[in-house]
Amino acid sequence: MQLVQLLPPGVSLLALVWLAVDAAFLTALLLYLQRGCDSGRSLLCSVFQDLIRYGKTKSGLRRPSWLQWFDIPKRCFWHFYFVSLVWNGFLLWILLHLLLQSVPVPEWLQAVLQFLCAGSEPQVLGGELSVVLAFSLLWLHSLRRLLECLFVSIFSNGVIHFVQYCFGLGYYILIGFTILGYCPLDRRTAVSLDDLLMQGNWYHILGLTLYVWASLHQYTCHCILADLRKSASGAIINLKHAVPTGDWFEKVSCPHYFAELLIYLSIAVVFGLLNTIWWLVVLYVLLSQALAAVLCHEFYHEKFDSYPIHRKAFIPLIF
């Protein structure tokens, strides 16, 4: 607890962690856009390029052979969503038992949240429905992405860095703490399901609508990418890359990344736009997906001479 006491008033350790993550990805994005650390310039630049790339954007990259020791198959992406499904499902189960049956939160979990969230904004009373919905949307998103990784996506032999893999696992654990930390956990009386539903507001409907819309488009885009490697009968015929077309691909190179941002924005809306720390999560998603989209956009332009020049990388008409 001494570490928390050293933090500025009103700032939690959790907020500082997200700020540090945001700063790291902003630095990486700006450094890449300024071409300040091209691969091969130095050993440090080679490591930098290896850390920011994954999958197809690593192909053709000049890499020291020893960096391949840290390669993990990209098809292991499903591990992230499995961890999120189990962990955040567990936290949602604890939250529902607290709210509906007054079952106390385990002491170890209270201690962790106290350590991470001490000094943060006051927890919002009457916002339990927002927290339940946020957890539910995150859990459903993890379930859908897990099923897509296992049954829709067709992975090539692309790789991710071991650091990226570890970060991805930790990310979904930290997300759970971030959502749960927004709800008061010291309540002594249960609420009924009707009480929760009475908290419903316009922003819950708006957030759910945005979530469904973005999720449908993301699923469609993942199906389009998978179909590029299938025959008309559905058989896998190659693992090559091709120019995707249809749906939001007509506007941007990486619409599935744009949809990911909208999904996290929808959860911010479900919180009534009031969860400050969640906005730091949204900022991370914006920066990380922007970096990945720029790398992917450049890959398409370098590989395909006839690639549509009107497409943006990430956000339609903007970036």
Curated annotation (Swiss-Prot):
Residue ranges in the Lumenal topological domain are 34-79, 144-158, 217-266
Mark the transmembrane ranges.
Answer: 13-33, 80-100, 123-143, 159-179, 196-216, 267-287
Instruction: Tell me what topology the record assigns in the membrane.
Output: Multi-pass membrane protein
The principal localisation class reads endoplasmic reticulum
Which keywords does UniProt give here?
Endoplasmic reticulum, Lipid metabolism, Membrane, NADP, Oxidoreductase, Transmembrane, Transmembrane helix
Q: Where in the cell is it found?
A: Endoplasmic reticulum membrane
What pathway does the annotation place this protein in? Protein modification; protein glycosylation
User: What EC number(s) has UniProt assigned to this enzyme?
Assistant: 1.3.1.94, 1.3.1.22
Record keyword Membrane present: yes
- In terms of domain of life, where is this protein from? Eukaryota
Cytoplasmic topology ranges: 1-12, 101-122, 180-195, 288-319
The molecular function terms of the Gene Ontology recorded here are:
3-oxo-5-alpha-steroid 4-dehydrogenase (NADP+) activity; oxidoreductase activity, acting on the CH-CH group of donors, NAD or NADP as acceptor; polyprenal reductase activity; polyprenol reductase activity
Q: Name one GO cellular component term.
A: endoplasmic reticulum membrane
Q: Which family does it belong to?
A: Belongs to the steroid 5-alpha reductase family. Polyprenal reductase subfamily.
Q: What is the protein name for this chain?
A: Polyprenal reductase
What gene name does this entry carry? Answer: srd5a3
